Regions:
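Pepsin/retropepsin-fold aspartyl endopeptidases
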Residues: 1-59, 64-155
Length: 155
């Protein structure tokens, strides 16, 4: 699977080893609705999208190497998602090293019309430059594909 993002991929860590995150792909893309969405490739070669997360706009990097949607602490606060300090029980590997994260569930994420409800996500405590649109969203779509010009998301 190609990664559309940078080396800032999020992977769950268990014990001393890295666990492969299993992303459930529903038979009929359960929870996905709407219309096909187009994401234009940025001048930097990455796929940046304006996501509507729980009713608010958040700029995200599309990253198939991220097992889940990952929110920066600042984006989470703007969305009204404020995990308690003791909720940061997870550990994730980023390009910056191992950091703590808090699991959350987002009501809805929509990118240019491709909507997914009840999306699992992580709020990364620190060290994440920008929020990532990972496989907990992408894996619930019926399909997504990349071309040199852009990315198509199909609910």
């Amino acid at each position: 699977m190609a990664s559309f993002g940078t080396a800032l991929t999020i992977r769950h860590l268990e014990g001393d080893g890295m666990a492969q995150a299993a992303t459930p792909v529903a038979e009929a893309a359960v929870g996905a609705s709407g219309t096909d969405a187009q994401v234009v490739k940025g001048a930097d070669g990455h796929y940046w999208a304006e996501a509507n997360i729980d009713g608010k706009a958040v700029r995200v990097l599309v990253d198939t190497g991220a097992s889940v949607v990952a929110l920066t602490r600042a984006d989470a606060l703007r969305l009204g998602v404020e995990p308690e300090p003791e909720a940061f029980t997870g550990k994730v590997q980023t390009a910056s090293g191992v950091v703590r994260a808090a699991p959350v569930q987002l009501k809805t994420i929509s990118v240019a019309g491709a909507r997914v409800d009840r999306v699992e996500a992580l709020v990364v405590e620190q060290g994440l430059e920008y929020s990532l649109l990972g496989m907990s969203y992408l894996g619930r779509l019926s399909a997504f594909s990349a071309t040199p010009a852009g990315l198509t998301l199909r609910p």
